[in-house]
Amino acid sequence: MKKILLVLAFFITIVTSAYPQLGNNNMTLLANIDNHTVPYSALWGYKDANDGREYAIIGTFDGTSFVDITDPGNIHEVGFVPSTSPGNSNNLWREMKTYSHYAYIVSEVGNSGIQIVDLQYLPDSVHYVKKFLAAGHSSTHSISQEGPYLYLNGSNGGFGSGVVVMDLADPENPVKRGSYNNYYVHDCRVKNDTIYAANIYDSRVSIIKATNKNSLSLITSFINLPNSGPHNTAVTSDSKYILVTDEIGNTPRQLKIWNREDLGNITFVTGWQPTGITTTIIHNVETYGNYALIAHYEAGIRLVDITNKSNPVEVAWYDTYPSTNSLDYEGCWGVYMFPSGKIIGSDRNTGLYVLKTTFNVKMAIEGFYNSVLNTMISGDTVKAYLRNSSSPYNIADSSAAVIDAISLTAKFNFFNAAAGNYYLIVSHRNSLETWSGNPVVYNPMGFNTYDFTDSQSKAYGNNMKSIDTSPVRYGVFSGDVNKDQSIDLSDLGMIDNDASNFSIGYIPSDVNGDNVADLSDITITENNAFNFITIIRP
């Protein structure tokens, strides 16, 4: 049954507890596409170097699907390449990577080889080049890539069950170079001509020198204790740490972080698993700067801040398999993040998920805030803008979200701004537009936060009002009813007119959020007008 769920980009993520079966946190679902025969398997991403369009590539039971995810409101399949053995019961999964404008797909089914797909004709279509079989090659469990080289992992025994290097100097006709077969390799990652191989059945991780592609050599290996069953690896951007996922073995099957700065003494740093969950299986991890993006089977997609390697902090998640958390191999298989910050994940049963982490802004509206309850009387919609940090401060991106009355947090989605420093501006329907005290660092490939409430200096020119002393909180000024960037007699006139007419409902003149225009709204606005409150911006 074909099922495509598209969610508008301004959809607000539901905030719940740390247990993923109870909800999702700090991730917005943009689309869930499930229109192929299950089970689904691995996925990868491809960004067109010419036009910047983004594509998800996801393995299905009967082939590989190519999905354009560029426009959050129009996510759709643009191509499909059938399996070399469709319907074969041994062909339940496939893995893929990209190089230049080509995708390379492998599977464990016999005689599957490497499927080569030309992506240069996107967004119109994909072009299937051929199935490539090197001498002695039949099947491969997983595939990795760095530069113009593929690394085939866990291929058929006669070809190389460890790691085999394929040269892509001619992308449509790979050439076998060297191999390393001391142990079976389930998966690997390659960084700076160094292979980090997961030897799942030998409970170890091997670090292999691949500077000479014709002659791979072991640098060192270590036992991935405790409860070892290393499925895949990832390496931090500074190459100082190795992240390892334990798919098999005793529980907990968790993420492990190892310090590899001294290759003669690789040391265990810490283990991590989702808060409150010990019964799900970790599968794949990818690293992006100071973040680890994890496919955690029935616990779904998890984003973990690994800035402090000794204390990883989970900052966002989306549970693709909310019905249970068990030791079954269901749920999320693979994950990938684009430079835009879009996250894709594959669920074995429900297909492709496209997500985006939110930019969480904590703020309070003066008129709506109750200092006795330390909450706002109600939530309300706020617009947020990212403006360039230098004159003329052009708008780079914008979003809208609802402030939660209890947490005072609004969760925004930005899709256009690149990584950089921006002024953050918040604008409410009858409050004064407020700029951040300084440009804020925005990283689309991470989780971003800003708190206006904890210091007056968080607003440019200290342009906020003290609204609570315990806890100390500051709020944006209320009363700019006509949105002319100052609070003055013209705003008072509008409120007075509505109050005289006993106006009620969701109206601009309702400054305190009680759905009535009356004396209390006039009082708030009059105080700010008396103090000549106006916008302060660079």
Give a label for each model feature:
Residues 390-408:
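Short, acidic Ser/Thr/Gly-rich low-complexity loop/linker segments typical of extracellular
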Residues 407-422, 430:
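Short Pro-Gly-centered beta-turn/loop motif in secreted/extracellular proteins
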